[in-house]
Protein backbone atom coordinates (compact mmCIF):
# COMPACT_ATOMS: atom_id res chain seq x y z
CA UNK A 1 0.00 0.00 0.00
CA UNK A 2 1.34 3.40 -0.98
CA UNK A 3 0.83 6.47 1.17
CA UNK A 4 1.23 9.61 -0.94
CA UNK A 5 -1.52 11.85 0.41
CA UNK A 6 -4.43 11.34 2.77
CA UNK A 7 -6.88 12.09 -0.08
CA UNK A 8 -6.59 8.42 -1.01
CA UNK A 9 -7.95 7.26 2.35
CA UNK A 10 -11.52 7.15 3.60
CA UNK A 11 -12.34 8.34 7.09
CA UNK A 12 -12.77 4.67 8.06
CA UNK A 13 -9.24 3.99 6.74
CA UNK A 14 -7.84 6.90 8.76
CA UNK A 15 -9.57 5.68 11.93
CA UNK A 16 -8.24 2.17 11.35
CA UNK A 17 -4.68 3.51 10.96
CA UNK A 18 -5.08 5.57 14.14
CA UNK A 19 -6.52 2.58 16.02
CA UNK A 20 -3.56 0.44 15.01
CA UNK A 21 -1.10 3.20 15.91
CA UNK A 22 -2.71 3.40 19.34
CA UNK A 23 -2.30 -0.37 19.74
CA UNK A 24 1.43 -0.03 19.01
CA UNK A 25 1.70 2.88 21.42
CA UNK A 26 0.09 0.70 24.07
CA UNK A 27 2.57 -2.12 23.59
CA UNK A 28 1.45 -4.20 20.61
CA UNK A 29 4.44 -6.10 19.27
CA UNK A 30 5.28 -7.25 15.76
CA UNK A 31 8.72 -8.58 14.98
CA UNK A 32 9.82 -9.27 11.43
CA UNK A 33 13.15 -10.54 12.87
CA UNK A 34 15.19 -8.49 10.43
CA UNK A 35 13.55 -10.12 7.42
CA UNK A 36 12.02 -6.88 6.15
CA UNK A 37 14.05 -3.92 4.94
CA UNK A 38 12.81 -0.33 4.69
CA UNK A 39 14.84 2.18 2.68
CA UNK A 40 14.64 5.74 3.96
CA UNK A 41 15.34 7.95 0.93
CA UNK A 42 15.79 11.53 2.07
CA UNK A 43 16.51 14.12 -0.60
CA UNK A 44 16.10 16.96 1.91
CA UNK A 45 17.43 17.42 5.43
CA UNK A 46 15.21 15.88 8.08
CA UNK A 47 15.58 14.98 11.70
CA UNK A 48 12.16 14.11 13.12
CA UNK A 49 10.62 12.39 10.07
CA UNK A 50 13.78 10.51 9.10
CA UNK A 51 14.58 9.15 12.52
CA UNK A 52 10.94 8.53 13.44
CA UNK A 53 10.64 6.22 10.43
CA UNK A 54 13.99 4.65 11.32
CA UNK A 55 12.80 4.01 14.90
CA UNK A 56 9.42 2.70 13.73
CA UNK A 57 11.17 0.18 11.47
CA UNK A 58 13.43 -0.82 14.36
CA UNK A 59 10.40 -1.29 16.63
CA UNK A 60 8.90 -3.63 14.02
CA UNK A 61 12.10 -5.66 13.82
CA UNK A 62 12.91 -4.35 10.35
CA UNK A 63 16.30 -3.34 9.06
CA UNK A 64 16.79 0.03 7.38
CA UNK A 65 18.86 1.37 4.53
CA UNK A 66 19.39 5.08 5.14
CA UNK A 67 20.04 7.00 1.93
CA UNK A 68 21.30 10.55 1.70
CA UNK A 69 21.11 12.17 -1.73
CA UNK A 70 24.24 14.25 -1.14
CA UNK A 71 26.35 11.09 -0.98
CA UNK A 72 24.78 9.27 -3.92
CA UNK A 73 24.62 9.05 -7.70
CA UNK A 74 21.81 11.60 -7.56
CA UNK A 75 24.69 14.10 -7.59
CA UNK A 76 25.60 12.72 -11.04
CA UNK A 77 22.05 12.92 -12.38
CA UNK A 78 20.45 9.66 -11.22
CA UNK A 79 16.66 10.00 -11.28
CA UNK A 80 14.32 9.32 -8.39
CA UNK A 81 12.86 6.43 -10.37
CA UNK A 82 16.30 4.85 -10.86
CA UNK A 83 17.13 5.29 -7.18
CA UNK A 84 13.88 3.62 -6.08
CA UNK A 85 14.32 0.81 -8.64
CA UNK A 86 17.81 0.17 -7.24
CA UNK A 87 16.48 -0.25 -3.71
CA UNK A 88 13.70 -2.44 -5.06
CA UNK A 89 16.27 -4.58 -6.92
CA UNK A 90 18.35 -5.23 -3.79
CA UNK A 91 15.31 -6.52 -1.95
CA UNK A 92 13.97 -3.60 0.04
CA UNK A 93 10.38 -4.20 1.03
CA UNK A 94 9.30 -0.54 1.15
CA UNK A 95 10.68 2.96 0.72
CA UNK A 96 10.01 6.14 2.66
CA UNK A 97 10.75 9.22 0.56
CA UNK A 98 11.23 12.89 1.47
CA UNK A 99 11.70 14.88 -1.72
CA UNK A 100 11.69 18.59 -2.60
CA UNK A 101 9.57 18.04 -5.73
CA UNK A 102 5.85 18.41 -5.14
CA UNK A 103 4.00 15.27 -6.25
CA UNK A 104 7.29 13.42 -6.87
CA UNK A 105 5.34 10.19 -6.54
CA UNK A 106 3.66 10.79 -9.91
CA UNK A 107 6.99 9.62 -11.41
CA UNK A 108 6.67 6.29 -9.56
CA UNK A 109 2.98 5.33 -9.72
CA UNK A 110 2.61 2.07 -11.61
CA UNK A 111 6.37 1.83 -12.20
CA UNK A 112 7.63 0.31 -8.95
CA UNK A 113 6.29 -2.71 -7.15
CA UNK A 114 7.28 -1.93 -3.56
CA UNK A 115 5.20 0.31 -1.29
CA UNK A 116 6.14 3.99 -1.23
CA UNK A 117 5.41 6.10 1.85
CA UNK A 118 5.72 9.85 1.53
CA UNK A 119 7.77 11.55 4.20
CA UNK A 120 6.94 14.87 2.56
CA UNK A 121 6.86 16.22 -0.98
CA UNK A 122 7.96 19.80 -1.61
CA UNK A 123 5.26 22.12 -0.35
CA UNK A 124 2.62 19.51 -1.20
CA UNK A 125 1.84 17.03 1.56
CA UNK A 126 3.21 15.34 4.64
CA UNK A 127 0.73 12.54 5.39
CA UNK A 128 2.73 10.86 8.16
CA UNK A 129 2.97 14.08 10.18
CA UNK A 130 -0.72 14.72 9.63
CA UNK A 131 -1.54 11.24 10.95
CA UNK A 132 0.55 11.98 14.02
CA UNK A 133 -1.31 15.27 14.50
CA UNK A 134 -4.65 13.46 14.18
CA UNK A 135 -3.57 10.89 16.74
CA UNK A 136 -2.62 13.65 19.18
CA UNK A 137 -5.97 15.41 18.68
CA UNK A 138 -7.86 12.15 19.18
CA UNK A 139 -5.88 11.37 22.35
CA UNK A 140 -6.59 14.83 23.76
CA UNK A 141 -10.27 15.16 22.81
CA UNK A 142 -11.42 11.61 22.05
CA UNK A 143 -13.10 12.69 18.82
CA UNK A 144 -12.85 15.05 15.85
CA UNK A 145 -16.48 16.03 15.39
CA UNK A 146 -17.29 19.64 16.22
CA UNK A 147 -13.70 20.68 16.88
CA UNK A 148 -12.40 23.90 15.42
CA UNK A 149 -8.73 23.57 14.52
CA UNK A 150 -6.49 26.55 13.78
CA UNK A 151 -3.34 26.04 11.75
CA UNK A 152 -0.76 28.81 12.15
CA UNK A 153 2.55 29.59 10.50
CA UNK A 154 3.55 29.69 6.86
CA UNK A 155 0.55 27.72 5.67
CA UNK A 156 1.15 28.52 2.00
CA UNK A 157 4.47 26.67 1.98
CA UNK A 158 3.76 24.12 4.73
CA UNK A 159 3.26 20.56 3.50
CA UNK A 160 2.02 19.65 6.98
CA UNK A 161 -0.62 22.39 6.89
CA UNK A 162 -1.76 21.19 3.46
CA UNK A 163 -2.14 17.60 4.67
CA UNK A 164 -3.89 18.66 7.86
CA UNK A 165 -6.30 20.95 6.02
CA UNK A 166 -7.04 18.23 3.48
CA UNK A 167 -7.99 15.61 6.06
CA UNK A 168 -9.41 17.76 8.86
CA UNK A 169 -12.08 19.30 6.69
CA UNK A 170 -13.37 15.77 6.02
CA UNK A 171 -13.48 14.65 9.65
Task: Identify the function of each model-found stretch.
Residues 1-55:
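Positively charged, low-complexity intrinsically disordered leader regions
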Residues 1-7, 72, 142, 158:
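Flexible, active-site-adjacent loop/turn segments at secondary-structure boundaries
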Residues 33-138:
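Phosphate/diphosphate ligand-binding glycine-rich loop within oxidoreductases
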Residues 16-20, 86, 107, 132-139, ...:
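Alpha-helical scaffold segments in soluble metabolic enzymes
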Residues 43-56, 139-171:
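Glycine-rich phosphate/diphosphate-binding loop of Rossmann-like nucleotide-binding domains
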Residues 7, 98, 120, 154-155:
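Short loop or secondary-structure boundary microenvironments that flank
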